[in-house]
């Protein structure tokens, strides 16, 4: 029985190792004609001696390179799946710190450090509140953070909006399961808070999602066009407990200044004039 097992090992090695024309025999075993290292071993088990084929030095290097490339490809595909399943706005998939036109600002630097220190950030449950006028880069930076954390840490991130959350809750049977998913994902980013419907049902669902996130002790990033004053003292009292919870969970960052959208539109118009007039 042992002899049969040994023979099977030898047969398997023979089928898995390629013998090249340049390979040669020396001291009773096969050597690689390229790197001149053994391609065959001698093993004695009991009364049985076998000479299974082995990977030579260059063969081992080629195998390790192939395995590394395979793992890198698998990781790349996994990251792509995470990004496409978690980031629900196609435009945000393209956001990257590499194309940030204001990398020197303290806000941009802080967001980069947020990613750099993600493991500690997640452990300490540190969220961000990005507020300011329209077109100042809030959604862009939210997308940058999401893409970078997914790519660097292979960590699931969900980037969504209140309207999307409400639509999903309306369309799914297992509402508790959906809310649980939003509560448990390592990082949840809610874009454009304050742009949602103001029905009692909508506000109750918004509070439930944010409160469940709070109870789960997971970081939350929120972007909004509202001012910090409007968040602290909302004109509609129904919003107060929602905004209070967000302020409690998130460190505020004011993204003010010239609208990036306006700046890009002007630059595009100038380029068009050069081409058309």
Feature map (PLM): residue ranges:
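Walker A/P-loop nucleotide-binding motif
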Residues: 122-143
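Structural motif
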Residues: 187-189, 221
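A short, basic N-terminal segment
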Residues: 1-106, 257, 265-277
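Walker B catalytic acidic pair
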Residues: 192-193
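P-loop NTPase catalytic core of nucleic-acid-dependent motor ATPases
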Residues: 94, 98, 105-128
């Amino acid at each position: 029985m042992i002899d049969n097992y040994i023979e099977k090992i030898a047969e398997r090695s023979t089928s898995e190792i390629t013998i090249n024309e340049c390979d040669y025999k020396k001291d009773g075993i096969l050597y690689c004609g390229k790197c001149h290292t053994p391609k065959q071993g001698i093993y004695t088990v009991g009364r049985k001696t076998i000479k299974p084929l082995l990977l030579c030095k260059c063969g081992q290097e080629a195998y390790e390179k192939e395995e590394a490339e395979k793992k890198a490809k698998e990781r790349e595909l996994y990251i792509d799946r995470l990004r496409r399943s978690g980031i629900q706005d196609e435009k945000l998939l393209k956001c990257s710190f590499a194309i940030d036109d204001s990398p020197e600002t303290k806000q941009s630097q802080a967001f980069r450090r947020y990613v750099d220190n993600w493991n500690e950030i997640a452990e300490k449950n540190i969220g961000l509140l990005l507020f300011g006028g329209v077109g100042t880069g809030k959604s862009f930076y939210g997308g940058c953070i999401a893409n970078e954390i997914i790519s660097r840490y292979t960590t699931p991130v969900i980037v969504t909006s209140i309207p999307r959350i409400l639509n999903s809750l309306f369309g799914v049977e297992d509402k508790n399961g959906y809310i649980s998913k939003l509560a448990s994902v390592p990082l949840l980013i809610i874009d454009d808070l304050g742009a949602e419907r103001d029905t009692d049902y909508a506000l109750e669902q918004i509070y439930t999602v944010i409160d469940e996130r709070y109870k789960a002790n997971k970081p939350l990033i929120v972007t909004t066009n509202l001012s910090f004053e409007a968040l602290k003292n909302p004109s509609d009292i129904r919003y107060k407990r929602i905004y209070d919870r967000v302020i409690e969970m998130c460190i505020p960052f004011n993204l003010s200044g010239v609208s990036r959208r306006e700046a890009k539109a002007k630059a595009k118009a100038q380029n068009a004039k050069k081409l058309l007039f």
